[in-house]
Amino acid sequence: EIIGGRFFYNPQDCRGRSVLDSGYRHEVRHEISIASPNHPIAHGLPDTFELTDELYLCEVFEDAIDPLLRSDHDFVREKFYSAHHAVTGNLYCNDNWYPDEGSAILGWTRQHKNSRIVYLQPGDNTATFGNANYRQLLANAIRWAAHRQ
């Protein structure tokens, strides 16, 4: 709850309902749009930018977060693989796995007690870390979370 979402490797209960394991997909080229352009974390960023990175089909608690980033990727079963299948040795499989459609929100902020929380899903590969927009995003997020903005 503190982070604002969860990734599961096995089916289980989440916030009072049964959910399947989460999904993943490596090396997805997608466009990210800034959902909150006036937020300090968005300072200096274009309205949209492209990344190629891993994406996750997981639980996002949209009622408890302030969206910051959205992807144009479709967060549906056909575009992801089952995390449970992966950890049991079947890496690129979604057989008999029928999760609900997921959230396209890739980054968000929230407050927990006196702490600022920021979650950024991108950051799985060197290409992402080498992207100037991602580096600006990450620097802004660190400053914001540390109350330096």
Language model features: what each stretch is:
Residues 1-83, 87:
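An acidic, glycine-rich "communication" segment
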Residues 74-149:
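Extracellular ligand-binding/catalytic regions of CAZymes and related secreted enzymes
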